[in-house]
Amino acid sequence: MPRKAKVVKDLKHFPKYATRQKNRCPICGRPRGFLRRFNMCRLCFREMALSGEITGVRKSSW
């Protein structure tokens, strides 16, 4: 029984929306439009890509 009580106690410390906390842009804190590959939101990605701060990223044109 003590082990079960410890597990229940540990579960109370987890945030309710853990995924939303994890997938936030570290630059602006935006929770939506998150790009996992670059670990930032789409707006910060666009600004940094256009200014040339992200290597290997170019604006596409055809």
Curated annotation (Swiss-Prot):
Query: What cellular component GO annotations does this protein have?
Result: cytoplasm; small ribosomal subunit
Pfam families, per the entry: Ribosomal_S14 (PF00253)
Task: State the SUPFAM superfamilies in the record.
Answer: Glucocorticoid receptor-like (DNA-binding domain)
Asked whether the UniProt record includes RNA-binding among its keywords, one would answer yes
What GO annotations for molecular function exist for this entry?
rRNA binding; structural constituent of ribosome; zinc ion binding
Note describing how the cofactor binds: Binds 1 zinc ion per subunit.
GO biological process terms held by the UniProt record? translation
The record's listing under Gene3D superfamilies reads:
30s Ribosomal Protein S14, Chain N
Q: Which cofactor does it need?
A: Zn(2+)
Protein residues bound to Zn(2+):
C25, C28, C41, C44
Q: Please tell me whether the keyword Ribosomal protein is annotated for this protein.
A: yes
Give a short account of what the protein does.
Binds 16S rRNA, required for the assembly of 30S particles and may also be responsible for determining the conformation of the 16S rRNA at the A site.
Assembly mode: Part of the 30S ribosomal subunit. Contacts proteins S3 and S10.
Name of this chain's protein? Small ribosomal subunit protein uS14
Q: What is the lineage of its organism?
A: Bacteria, Pseudomonadati, Aquificota, Aquificia, Aquificales
